[in-house]
A protein has these predicted regions:
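Conserved cofactor-binding/catalytic machinery of classical short-chain dehydrogenase/reductase
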Residues: 7, 155, 202
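Conserved Walker B
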Residues: 28, 50, 201
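Short, glycine-rich nucleotide/cofactor-binding loops
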Residues: 195-203
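Acidic, Mg2+-coordinating active-site environments of NTP-dependent enzymes
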Residues: 17-20, 24, 33-37, 42-196
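Short, conserved glycine- and acidic-residue-centered signature motifs
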Residues: 1-4, 149, 203
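Charge-dense, low-complexity intrinsically disordered segments
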Residues: 2, 55-58, 201
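Conserved nucleotide-sensing/catalytic segment adjacent to the nucleotide-binding pocket
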Residues: 1-28
Length: 203
């Protein structure tokens, strides 16, 4: 989750002191609601999805959506770039909030967008994907299991491009990605070729 403000700012200050120029972090709905990110200057921010998680905290879908929308309505500066997954039913609502602030919006999705997933083929150790960005196709091997991984990678690519990276170089790095421990992590391959995974995800 998003650290409390003092820890967050201390961590970012230490990163800057160590000449780290870029950072990525989660902007959790709890953290946004509790204003833990206030005062952090962001270049870009992304919206992945809106599900029924965390209703124990927010109580209503409206309050939960408003908390997430705070990332674009309050935290991301007017000159920031919003990367929005428009496959999610609330994606266009979030894009409208960002656009109303004057933020540049980059849309991502499987069914179209500025950056979209146009092909995907799975095997036992990962997937081959094709992304299209601004009329150009980029193919890559993702050593990650699960269709959702391509969705997450697509949004992450949008964020990195929004921060000024060359798109071709962004897509060239994808084969070097590693999985998060415990999230569809390839643990072993049996003698018969069957893959064994560890997965603690619970959405």
């Amino acid at each position: 989750t998003t650290p409390e403000p003092i820890t967050l700012h201390r961590t970012l200050a230490a990163a800057k002191a160590n000449r780290i120029t870029h950072a990525a972090m989660e902007a959790s709905s709890h953290g946004l609601d509790q204003r833990r990110l206030d005062g952090v200057t962001l270049t870009a921010a992304g919206f992945t999805n809106f599900t029924q998680d965390h209703l124990d905290y927010h109580h209503t879908f409206e309050a939960y959506f408003d908390a997430k929308a705070g990332l674009f309505a309050r935290v991301l500066p007017d000159n920031g770039i919003a990367v929005i997954n428009i496959d999610d039913p609330r994606g266009l609502d979030m894009a409208a909030i960002a656009a109303a602030r004057g933020q540049e919006v980059i849309t991502v999705g499987r069914d179209g967008g500025d950056l979209y997933l146009s092909a995907q083929r799975f095997d036992s150790t990962g997937q081959d994907v094709r992304f299209d960005y601004k009329g150009k196709a980029y193919t890559a091997r993702l050593p990650l299991i699960g269709g959702f991984q391509a969705d997450n990678v697509m949004l992450a690519c949008g964020l990195v491009i929004a921060c000024g990276a060359d798109p071709a170089r962004v897509f060239e790095t994808l084969p070097h990605l590693g999985t998060v421990r415990g999230r569809m992590q390839l643990a072993a391959t049996r003698d018969n070729g069957a893959a064994v995974f560890v997965d603690y995800a619970h959405t």
